[in-house]
Swiss-Prot record:
Any one Gene Ontology BP term: inner mitochondrial membrane organization
Phosphoserine: residues carrying this PTM: S204
Gene source species: Homo sapiens
Annotated stretches, region: Disordered: 187-268
Pfam family, one: ApoO
Transit peptide: 1-27
Assembly and oligomerization: Component of the mitochondrial contact site and cristae organizing system (MICOS) complex, composed of at least MICOS10/MIC10, CHCHD3/MIC19, CHCHD6/MIC25, APOOL/MIC27, IMMT/MIC60, APOO/MIC23/MIC26 and MICOS13/MIC13. This complex was also known under the names MINOS or MitOS complex. The MICOS complex associates with mitochondrial outer membrane proteins SAMM50, MTX1 and MTX2 (together described as components of the mitochondrial outer membrane sorting assembly machinery (SAM) complex) and DNAJC11, mitochondrial inner membrane protein TMEM11 and with HSPA9.
Protein encoded by which gene: APOOL
UniProt name for this protein: MICOS complex subunit MIC27
């Protein structure tokens, strides 16, 4: 029993010491955590060091819609063009019918005689080309009908003729320009040599140039006697100037002796 009491007495102080040590360590950790200042707190989250932008890849549904759109785009554009053309044609014909109805409802006095002249001229063309070819059967009635229309309506016929002449001239100029451009392109292509021939010519010229220079150097022309004598005198004078040596006795060394030339600076 005495031993048990001694054990209890020894274990209780050890437990108290351990508890005090753990509490002290926790307090130290809390104090360390509270030492951070508000200015040092991060406002934003730090971005990753190795970031890379990756585009979103389209899915199967998007690829299918894109292929359908590209396949049907040209057909849709063609259908739109046809629809606009037909719509404009229908609107023009309806407007022409309305104008014709208004005009025929209250026609002028000379309308019926003029129409009679035009129809009679067309029938005359049919009768004259009755036994002819198909070309005559088409051209004769149209030609005589247009002739009657020009006689009956001269002002309108002149305006129509001017407009058609301008259109024909513009189209002819466009055709002429296109043909001329094609002709000039073909002529330029024919006139220009091939690049291989150019390289051959360049190499041959490069090889022949030194031969020509050597050939020119070989054929020397004799100079006249006067020029040769002048050249000789010039060469002699230059050689004499280079070979001239001054007399050391005549040289002025100042106050120094000629023997001490290495020790003092001389005057020239």
């Amino acid at each position: 029993m005495a031993a048990i009491r001694m054990g209890k007495l020894t274990t209780m102080p050890a437990g108290l010491i351990y508890a005090s040590v753990s509490v002290h360590a926790a307090k130290q950790e809390e104090s360390k955590k509270q030492l951070v200042k508000p200015e040092q707190l991060p406002i934003y989250t730090a971005p990753p060091l190795q970031s890379k932008y990756v585009e979103e890849q389209p899915g199967h549904l998007q690829m299918g819609f894109a292929s359908i759109r590209t396949a049907t785009g040209c057909y849709i554009g063609w259908c739109k063009g046809v629809y606009v053309f037909v719509k404009n044609g229908i609107m023009d014909t309806v407007q022409f019918g309305k104008d014709a109805y208004v005009y025929l409802k209250n026609p002028p006095r000379d309308f019926l005689p003029k129409m009679g002249v035009i129809t009679v001229s067309g029938l005359a063309g049919l009768v004259s080309a009755r036994k002819g070819s198909k070309f005559k059967k088409i051209t004769y009635p149209l030609g005589l009908a247009t002739l009657g229309a020009t006689v009956c309506y001269p002002v309108q016929s002149v305006i129509i003729a001017k407009v058609t002449a301008k259109k024909v001239y513009a189209t002819s100029q466009q055709i002429f320009g296109a043909v001329k451009s094609l002709w000039t392109k073909s002529s330029k292509e024919e006139s220009l040599p091939k690049p291989k021939e150019k390289t051959k010519l360049g190499s041959s010229s490069e090889i022949e140039v030194p031969a020509k220079t050597t050939h020119v150097l070989k054929h020397s022309v004799p100079l006249p006697t006067e020029l040769s004598s002048e050249a000789k005198t010039k060469s002699e004078s230059t050689s004499g100037a280079t070979q001239f040596m001054p007399d050391p006795k005549l040289m002025d060394h100042g106050q120094s002796h000629p023997e001490d030339i290495d020790m003092y600076s001389t005057r020239s």
